[in-house]
């Protein structure tokens, strides 16, 4: 797991290959793997930060987007790890970096929120998030809201 590189960019700074890699990974997981026939690309992509984790070969292995919301709150969304790269700890590394990058980019950030698929809660709990809602359906998949207060 050495030679990993985090890259953080806003939409207008992404090159064509980075954008392709992001949309390919998200579509392969959120649409194809999870059989979720809902649009994957949305207007949020235009105004959020894109956090990418690449391996030594330059392959995009994990991704999340960082969305500043109301005062002092950042939403972490579209957290995804390449199916072939799971069980390598990339999800946890990504989340720790997402928190660190959010603190740097949005210095007043004190609260972090996300919408977790039910099965992914242990990952988010491992970095300090706590469940703060009952289960609800998002695109037909059970989710819960989770929050981390600094």
From Swiss-Prot:
Domain of life: Eukaryota
Name of the molecule in the record: UPF0039 protein C11D3.02c
Single GO molecular function: acyltransferase activity, transferring groups other than amino-acyl groups
Gene Ontology annotations for the cellular component aspect, listed alphabetically: cytosol; nucleus
Domain N-acetyltransferase, chain residue ranges per copy: 9-150
PANTHER family: GLUCOSAMINE 6-PHOSPHATE N-ACETYLTRANSFERASE
Family: Belongs to the UPF0039 (ElaA) family.
Cleavable signal peptide: none
InterPro entries: Acyl_CoA_acyltransferase, GNAT_dom, GNPNAT1-like
Pfam family, one: Acetyltransf_10
Upper classification of the organism: Eukaryota, Fungi, Dikarya, Ascomycota, Taphrinomycotina
